[in-house]
């Protein structure tokens, strides 16, 4: 696998959303709120893996590590859904992300 970036993730999410649009309701600003709530839920699952398994198992136990990464993937999927709901392109996201990075570099 080569470069896996925001554009690739958004394309994957568009495919998934298109497949299930009748049941999930598609992507729109009105749906963003629900996607964000699902993202929070998935973040809680990431936290549960950390709390219940600990750092050492995440780093050294392949099953725990896989479970942790799967939950992080769920977070990223919902994150990308929110971007898509608000029609935020990879280029727009990258521009603002890099600007924010520069701000943070010069903050303290």
Model-predicted segments: where are they?
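Flexible "arm" and connector segments at domain edges
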Residues: 1-108
């Amino acid at each position: 696998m080569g470069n896996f970036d925001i554009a690739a993730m958004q394309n994957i999410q568009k495919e998934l959303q298109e497949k299930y649009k009748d049941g999930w309701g598609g992507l729109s600003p009105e749906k963003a709120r629900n996607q964000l709530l699902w993202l929070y839920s998935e973040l809680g699952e990431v936290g549960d893996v950390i709390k219940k398994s600990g750092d050492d198992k995440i780093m050294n136990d392949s099953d725990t590590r896989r479970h942790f990464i799967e939950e992080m993937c769920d977070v990223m999927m919902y994150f990308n859904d929110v971007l898509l709901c608000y029609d935020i392109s990879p280029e727009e996201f990258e521009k603002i992300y890099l600007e924010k990075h520069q701000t943070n570099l010069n903050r303290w």
